[in-house]
Design a protein with these regions (language model features):
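ABC ATPase NBD coupling module
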Residues: 20-22, 76-93, 107, 111, ...
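Conserved ABC transporter NBD signature motif
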Residues: 67-78
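Conserved ABC ATPase signature
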Residues: 151-155, 159
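Conserved catalytic motifs of ABC-family nucleotide-binding domains
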Residues: 172
Length: 261
């Protein structure tokens, strides 16, 4: 993990509400969070705690009602007009809960994984792209010769998620958002996905990962630091061993007890 004191990506005093003006539902209350280069930050909490909303705001996928978000010390607030937004979009990878909703059923694996390169790296020729697709699939734990020509319908849930991960890392992003990447697959596949993220961290030690998860068993094996959200507020945050070993809030203790850690 990087020793830099300056976060790669940071959010400050984020508030967010949904719904019509006459019936607004606030889901985030003055929430701040950051992640450093090379760090894995786990954002945990129960359903409806605001985990996904916070991380989507941090990656520029949603806008906040108030507060600020900075990528490499440049604001991304305001979308395309902001100085940091374009850089973040080009230097981030996304992995969501349902891999099949992220893959075009008409495309073979090779085309799906290559898509970010074809959109963002027009300087690369087909040979360069093929080599990078092969490398990304290999890092994701998939044998390229066995998977390049498959369609999503030919994949198990775990295999499809690893294809999505390969696509997320194809551009060597500086930050990856993994939003519940293991919740829709079986236990054996979860172990493989966990190993895939460990391999990414080993091969690319400066890459930051923000992982949204309700599975503390997964979190304790991969995260350097934990942020606990409850009803849209930060309950506590700190190094993983400290939060899980000596929780400071009743809510965190309840999560740990429920997970039987």
């Amino acid at each position: 993990m990087s020793n830099s004191s300056v976060p790669l990506l940071s959010a400050h005093s984020i508030t967010k509400s949904f719904g019509p003006r006459t019936a607004r539902h606030q889901v985030l209350f003055d929430v701040s969070a950051d992640v450093h280069a090379g760090e894995c930050l786990a954002v945990i909490g129960g359903s409806g705690s605001g985990k996904s909303t916070l991380t989507r705001i941090m990656l520029g996928l949603e806008s906040a009602d108030s507060g600020s978000v900075e990528y490499e010390s440049q604001s991304i607030v305001g979308g395309r007009k902001s100085p940091g937004f374009a850089a973040l979009r080009h230097e981030s990878g996304l992995v969501f809960q349902d891999p099949f909703s992220s893959l075009d059923p008409r495309w073979r694996v090779a085309k799906s994984v290559a898509e970010p390169l074809r959109l963002q790296r027009r300087d690369l020729n087909n040979t360069d792209i093929d080599e990078r697709v092969t490398a990304a699939l290999t890092m994701a734990g998939l044998e390229p010769a066995d998977f390049l020509n498959r369609y999503p319908i030919d994949l198990s849930g775990g295999q499809a998620q690893r294809v999505v991960i390969a696509r997320a890392i194809i551009n060597e992003p500086k930050v990856i958002l993994a939003d519940e990447p293991m919740s829709a697959i079986d236990v054996a596949a979860r172990i493989q996905i966990l190993a895939t993220f460990a391999a990414i961290r080993a091969a690319r030690p400066s890459t930051a990962i923000i992982m949204v998860s309700h599975d503390l068993g997964v979190v304790q094996h991969i995260a350097d630091r934990i942020l606990v959200l409850h009803d849209g507020r930060v309950e506590e945050t700190g190094p993983t061993a400290e939060v899980l070993g000596n929780p400071q809030s009743d809510y965190t203790r309840q999560l740990i007890e429920a997970a039987s850690l």
